[in-house]
Amino acid sequence: MSETVTVDSMKPQQIERETRRTQLNRGELAERIARAVPRDGRAEPLKGLRLLRVSSPTEQVHSVSDPAFCVIAQGSKEVLLGDDRYQYDPMHYLLATAELPIVSHVIEASQERPYLSLSVKLDPTLVGSVMVEAGHVSPRSHADVRAINVSPLDASLLDAVVRLVRLLDTPAEASFLAPLITREIVYRLLVGEQGGRLRNIAVQDSHTHRITRAVEQLRKELDQPLRIDDIARELGMSVSSVPADR
């Protein structure tokens, strides 16, 4: 009985320590990104790691998403994909699993507290390798085929992100350790809430992969009449599944 009471009495302390660690990590992440990008703009200090600083809310920007894991250290952002809107902040991460046209804009940013974020590019080969090593099987269904979604950023995933950014201070170590921490991030994503979606990018015949191929083909044929039926037939998809701005 006394042992149970002791364990129960530790729970609030554990929660408090975890909360404190998360707060410290968020603060450190913002500080390190601000130091790495001292003025508004982008930087890629490590291969596949992109940093962004913005000092005021932005207008909507049209771009093409890459498969990437995105974290905000300070501020907030909204991403639009078709009719869907995804808003995230330092307590959430965004996972993009396909190369698709999106619209995005920074919502919360100021000179005193600029928008600070990072993204880690996700290589399908790396995802597949981590899946094999971790013993994850490929998804058998495509229940969630959304190319973008937002989830809570847990303490373990945030901790790995902070360790990756710390490597900016030690370039000699970064070349060896950055790939290892990136693998850890991929692993934690695979076992997390969006693991099923992430596994799709490593499967060559997945719905997400076919959508990406369709977009790539549309890009190559911008100067040609749009033939949705032909593209759908070639990719083995239904006409309604092929992305097009109709």
Predicted regions and their residues:
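Short alpha-helical elements of helix-turn-helix
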Residues: T208-T212, S240
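Localized chelating/binding microdomains
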Residues: V61, Y93, A214, E221, ...
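Basic/polar phosphate-binding segments, predominantly the helix-turn-helix DNA-binding elements
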Residues: E184, R188-Q194, Q204, R219-E221, ...
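Residue-level marker of regulatory loop/turn positions in helix-turn-helix DNA-binding domains and
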Residues: V61, A174, A178, V203, ...
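N-terminal regulatory/effector-sensing and dimerization cores
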Residues: G41-S138
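Long, charge-rich low-complexity segments
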Residues: E3-V7, Q13-R17, S117-L122, P225-A244
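Amphipathic alpha-helical segments enriched in hydrophobic/aromatic residues interleaved with Lys/Arg
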Residues: D8-E28, V127-E184, R188, G196-N200, ...
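A short, N-terminal "cap"/entry segment at the start of jelly-roll beta-barrel domains
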Residues: M1-P45, R50-L52, T58-Q60, R140-R146
